[in-house]
Amino acid sequence: AGPSPIAGDQCHENFFSMSWQNDQTPEAMGKHMQDAGIKSVYLMAPNYQAGKDMLSGFKRYYKGNVVGEVYTKLGQSDFQAELSALRAAKPETTMIFQPGGMGINFVKQWKQAGMDGVSKLYQVFSVDGVSLPALKDSALGILGTQTWSPDLDNPINKKFVADYKAQFGGYPSFYAAQAYDTILAIDYAIAKSGSKDTAKMRAALATGDIPTTRGNLKMNTNHFPIQNIYLRETVKDADGVVTTKVIGTVFNNHADSYAVNCKF
């Protein structure tokens, strides 16, 4: 995760993120939905910093009619009241950020309530490698945006996904990919600088071209990655396993909006 204050005026020269700044992924969803000509959307996220960042990022690029913006309780498991209100609002689309168990419960209750006939569901961090083992077929066809996907076509990612599946018997999540990328970044910094000295490693990461599962990454001035963000669809692979696949690139080399406020 990447809270906006850490990317902005609370940044630190010794902090590097190998994930994303919170706004970036929903910014891509906002752009996709804006470009698709979607007229109205109902927004929902948990009431904490990441939830607020996610919806702020979405609205930065989506300029249609936001007919509702609801902040749910962090850790909430029952969404029947919210779904009833959403049904009454009849938005063309719904965009959610409900990570982890919240997303599992939300999508299952959405399906059980027949909400696909009311509104088209879009999401960020709610249907992914973390939740798909529980959601399975109920997540098929749902679109989301992400900086990584198991089908990204580069040598590092192919090896990572194959090795992970061989050891654990399933697809890795983006958390696993980012953990792998973090180790690659540390190794790169030591190799490039020829040292374990903090200042030299910092300089190597800040100016380098870091090899990762997402391709080679450069760091912004606030030490958050400048990276592609993809549109993904939940599908079944050739073996019938539910996963995600890239169906488009929304942003190429996308930088976050808070780096201008970062002063080391």
Cite the ranges covered by each PLM segment:
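Short, well-structured alpha-helical segments in soluble
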Residues: 31-35, 78-90, 112
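Periplasmic-binding protein-like
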Residues: 40-45, 90-100, 106, 118-124, ...
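Short, well-structured alpha-helical segments that form the helix of a local strand-helix-strand
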Residues: 197-214
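Solvent-exposed, acidic/polar segments of extracytosolic/periplasmic ligand-binding ectodomains
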Residues: 209-264
